[in-house]
């Protein structure tokens, strides 16, 4: 007999991907832990100053005779949208997936001078 037959099941909508963001004068670094997400399911797109990250976490195969008694992990599609500042080099953004399955997105900042003198022509 099943011991935990009356535990409530957990349901969720498509969750956001948690991330950390760091900044220096030269760049912005975004770090996302993506355990269980395969590289071929990841997509990064930029549109209207927004970085959109999507992926999918696939449930490992479980023997047919096993019945779920607790479900805390989310399996399925993931999505996150991050607003980007306009003062960056959009064409130089790059990313890498580490062996620990952490996505790192490096966003170089454009140099914006504090003060510009504009000559007046005659």
Task: Indicate where each model-derived feature is located.
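Alpha-crystallin/small heat shock protein
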Residues: 1-122
């Amino acid at each position: 007999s099943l011991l935990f037959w009356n535990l409530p099941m957990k349901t969720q909508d498509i969750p956001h991907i948690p991330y950390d963001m760091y900044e220096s004068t030269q760049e912005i670094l975004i770090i996302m832990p993506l355990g269980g997400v395969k590289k071929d399911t990841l997509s990064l797109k930029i549109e209207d100053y927004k970085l959109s990250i999507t992926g999918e976490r696939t449930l490992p195969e479980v023997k047919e005779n096993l019945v779920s008694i607790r479900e805390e992990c989310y399996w399925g599609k993931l999505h996150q949208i991050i607003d980007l500042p306009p003062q960056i080099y959009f064409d130089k953004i790059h990313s890498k997936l580490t062996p620990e399955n952490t996505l790192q997105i490096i966003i170089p900042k454009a140099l914006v001078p504090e003060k510009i003198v504009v000559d007046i022509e005659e």
